[in-house]
């Protein structure tokens, strides 16, 4: 299932659609998340609980692997937004070359509490971007704004 993009603004729409195209078809399609970032400063992804994403069927909580995956994607999305700002106005070939380099090289996830809920929001922002790597911070909350997990991701950018 293709990744849905629900954003406002022409630039944000362009970068989010490009990110969605790069991320599909792949494992990301299994998660069936939507990109709902409201600015080029923070990545926001939404994910709904489905049976195939449950880790513990007795308590119906989100699987830990799903949590780490959505946080990793959110972190990469924040980096993608940041790099997109740097290459705005450049030819598409230059954009693709720079944006295509983004890849996870390290990921740390802290599970704060079980992934209870029906709707989840992953947010991410940039901690640092250098010439070779970028670091982002991510959080996952449920629909009641309960913090489920936090993460820090390191990504190649150069």
Can you describe what each PLM-predicted range is?
Residues 1-158:
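Terminal targeting signals and extreme-terminal segments of soluble enzymes
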């Amino acid at each position: 299932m293709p990744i849905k993009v629900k954003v406002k603004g022409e630039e944000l729409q362009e970068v989010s659609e490009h990110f969605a195209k790069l991320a599909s078809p792949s494992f990301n399609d299994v998660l069936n998340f939507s990109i709902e970032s409201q600015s080029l400063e923070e990545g926001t992804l939404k994910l709904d609980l489905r049976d195939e994403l449950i880790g513990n069927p007795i308590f119906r909580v989100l699987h830990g692997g799903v949590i780490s995956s959505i946080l990793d994607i959110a972190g990469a999305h924040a980096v993608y937004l940041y790099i997109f700002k740097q290459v705005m106005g450049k030819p598409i070939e230059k954009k693709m070359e720079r944006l295509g380099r983004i890849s996870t090289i390290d990921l740390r996830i802290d599970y704060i509490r079980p992934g209870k809920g029906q709707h989840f929001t992953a947010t991410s922002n940039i901690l640092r971007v250098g010439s070779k790597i970028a670091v982002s911070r991510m959080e996952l909350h449920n629909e009641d704004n309960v913090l489920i997990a936090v993460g820090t991701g390191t990504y190649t950018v150069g």
